[in-house]
Amino acid sequence: MTYELEQLGYKKQVCQKCGNTFWSIRERATCGDAPCDEYEFIGNPVTDKQYDLMGIQKKFKGFFKDHGHTPINRYPVLAKRWRNDVFLVGASIYDFQPWVTSGMVRPPANPLVVAQPSIRLNDVDNVGRTGRHMTCFTMGAHHAFNTDETPIYWKNETLRYCHEFLVSIGINPEEITYIESWWKGGGNEGPSFEICAHGVELATLVFIQYATTKDGLKEIPLKIVDTGYGLERIAWVSQGTPTAYDATFGSVIDKLTDISGVELNTEILSENARIAGMMDIEDISDLKLLRKKVADKLSLDPDMLKKTTAPMEAIYIVADHTRCLSFMLADGIIPSNVKEGYLARLVLRRTVKYMNELGLNESLSDIMKMQVDYLSKTYPEIKDNKDHIINITDLEEERYHTTLTKGKNLVKRSIKTLKKQNKKSFPTDMLINFYDSHGIPPETVEAISKENAFDANIPDNFYTQIAAAHEEEEEEEIEEMELNFPKTKLSFYDDLKQRTFTAKVLGVVDSNKIILNQTIYYPEGGGQPSDIGTITRVNGEVLNITYAQKVDGIVLHHVAKEDESKLDNIVGEEITGEIDSKRRDLLTRNHTATHLVIASAREVLGKHIWQAGAQKGLDKTRIDLSHYKRISHEEVQEIERLANKRVQENHPVNIQWYDRTDAEVKYGFKLYQGGIVPGKNIRVVEIPGIDVQACAGTHCEKTGDIGVIKLLRTERVQDGVERLEYAVSDSGIKKIQDDDDIIRNSSDVFGVDAEQLPRTCKRFFNEWKEQQKRIKSLEKQLAQVKIFSLENEIANINGYNVITEVLDVDNNQLREIAINLVEKEEVADIAILINNNGNIVASSNNKILEKGMKMGDVVNDIGKFLGGRGGGKPTLAQGAKMTDLSRKDEAFESVKEQIRSWN
């Protein structure tokens, strides 16, 4: 492993500070990495020319292209496009997990080079403060995937490439060190090197060659060169700027300082970065120690330093977060309260928070425009999504401000509750609940707490804790069924028109599930229900099949309960199967229609549209789409028009099996709209020029076979997900006819033609509203008359005017009379009124409340006599089901007795 280093003149040494083994050309006491060595490049660039991020990315890819590597385009930062275990890409190797790294699928090129934007939110609280931490960074990587049959290159070549690249940009080889290490993760491990120069780590070279097992390390057949070069850091050392942010964000920083009026103090920033580089900030949640060290070094008061650095840190945070957001939103993440959408919203709201701290008058979308324009020089696909990004940020910023307004009252109420419990600060889980469930950021909690003399107790690493809790997809536990049978041949793929078949029975499990060697029964999957039908034995007995299920490639045919007794001695028998043809045809049309609806929705609503779930049905089908706002009626109509236009155009529906890598190279990750399909080979369903998906379902030969698509309704199923329901073919026609019947019947009721129905309904509705106004006016007059008649019934008890009556009025009048007697007319201090329906209203003024009598208690006390209950505010409460009015006098007297007892 070290042969190449020796050839390059490197000698093995041991760091006198950390004890790590490293390699260096010159003799040195330390390993070259922080905290053993201080940053030496700040104010002193160490390359032959200065590179911005775009420049070093071009240089990196060009170098490795010249050395036999195929450049590939970046993958989306949304890893869920091709894998189920994580939400976001955290390193370039994520691009190739699990399919390539498992050896199941060949890589898109071998060897290859990629500059992969990666997102890690585990240090989000350190961004802007240390000079180097970022939420989004570009990992330059060259990868090689080696097998015994096809070796590409391994350790020596990897070390040589790294050395030659760093030297090619002007870094003195005598300043480069290679620190020996060991990498472990994701069930694999192997030796590695951390490459440092001038006090900063620039790259990591990992050689994945072992599987981690309970019995120790086991060599794996696929040996992977997994490298990661920090391109932002390389740009930083080439420029020698005070922070990595200055080297990375270019004109975005300049524009932010211009509009905010913030001046960047290079002396403070440089010293802060140097000292932060000497500290293991990742393990320090409280950054006060860093601030103290910087203050001591510069002979400044720590509080004054914090005040000085806060706006500079905010500039860097806004620049970093808007870059992260640009990739997130351009790659299809919709901010929401769950999964990857939660992480996007977290970053977005932190951005707005720091914009507010800077006192910016600009909107978030104004800042995003700056970032999008800057990034688009390297990533044109981001500019293609500019309108979408701006629409989302405008909407999300508005939602954020609405959330803050609503949330303040919740925080105030919580403070009162905690004070009553003699608590002096918020527990962390309550702060997390404020943020997770109500969207209230800790800074808002802190501000309200100060106003109410309460300790917010916000952890320094609050956002890091939040992000860590939401970064990985929760694995769904599936109860496995062990089946020792060969996989079932899915014969319906050979001929989708086949409706009968013959097969051999291989076994029966759980007394009611038949396993065959082959089948045309479609097993439930991809949102498509299974086929149903019959299996006929050689003796003529017919078994009804109610459900087909696939487990690890084996199809289980569920037999109806009433036919389970017919399964004796069936194993080994040749049977005849038949599926319900009408059901299959309708589900087939529904499935192809779903592809058209998705494609039409994407054209109408935007490229961000992605399937979040689907369920095909006989009467109606639904599709869930990632979208950031409600779908309007006009948009629904346009989606329906487009989908039916494509039905009428009678496009071919092409179905073909592809090698997974070939399919991804040809079509991209839009293949996985309907979910991630496993396997080396995938079945691709393409409607040319309209839609393409990896799909295992049954489909029409042409779109014209669908007949008609009728959109029924939309629904918001969760934050960031919109549902479309629609009916297809005969079900669609029936829905159109049902709607026509409703219109015709309504027209008959009003005695007008259908064209006049909207105008007639509007006229009747307006007349009804006018009648309601008149009725309410008359009710008020009747209530006033009733009030006058009740004044003679008021009793003075112990100095308080009390009225208790049963009235023949409706609920609304009852409430109005009770309130007016106390508040408007002021003839009673307390009014307790019941109507013949058993409703009760109790109203009082502050004189009664000051004696400790609350109307909610009064209503429930009376309910003990009359059988009902209720509740409300201290001076106004309501109740119902006071049905035992024979005890009304007894109930009223109990209240009067309390009043008599007052001193």
UniProtKB/Swiss-Prot annotation:
Cofactor binding note: Binds 1 zinc ion per subunit.
Essential cofactor(s): Zn(2+)
GO molecular function: alanine-tRNA ligase activity; aminoacyl-tRNA deacylase activity; ATP binding; tRNA binding; zinc ion binding
Any GO BP: alanyl-tRNA aminoacylation
This protein's record includes keyword ATP-binding: yes
Keyword terms, alphabetized: Aminoacyl-tRNA synthetase, ATP-binding, Cytoplasm, Ligase, Metal-binding, Nucleotide-binding, Protein biosynthesis, RNA-binding, tRNA-binding, Zinc
Subcellular location: Cytoplasm
Catalytic activities: tRNA(Ala) + L-alanine + ATP = L-alanyl-tRNA(Ala) + AMP + diphosphate
Assigned EC number: 6.1.1.7
Keyword Endoplasmic reticulum: no
InterPro entries assigned to the protein according to its UniProt record, in alphabetical order: aa-tRNA-synth_II/BPL/LPL, Ala-tRNA-lgiase_IIc, Ala-tRNA-ligase_IIc_anticod-bd, Ala-tRNA-synth_IIc_core, Ala-tRNA-synth_IIc_N, Ala-tRNA_lgiase_arc, Ala-tRNA_ligase, DHHA1_dom
Assigned GO CC terms: cytoplasm
SMART domains: tRNA_SAD (SM00863)
Predominant cellular place of this UniProt entry's protein: cytoplasm
Pfam families in alphabetical order: DHHA1, tRNA-synt_2c, tRNA_SAD
UniProt binding sites for Zn(2+): H591, H595, C695, H699
Protein function: Catalyzes the attachment of alanine to tRNA(Ala) in a two-step reaction: alanine is first activated by ATP to form Ala-AMP and then transferred to the acceptor end of tRNA(Ala). Also edits incorrectly charged Ser-tRNA(Ala) and Gly-tRNA(Ala) via its editing domain.
Free-text note on domains in this protein's UniProt record: Consists of three domains; the N-terminal catalytic domain, the editing domain and the C-terminal C-Ala domain. The editing domain removes incorrectly charged amino acids, while the C-Ala domain, along with tRNA(Ala), serves as a bridge to cooperatively bring together the editing and aminoacylation centers thus stimulating deacylation of misacylated tRNAs.
Protein family according to the UniProt entry: Belongs to the class-II aminoacyl-tRNA synthetase family.
Protein name from the UniProt record: Alanine--tRNA ligase
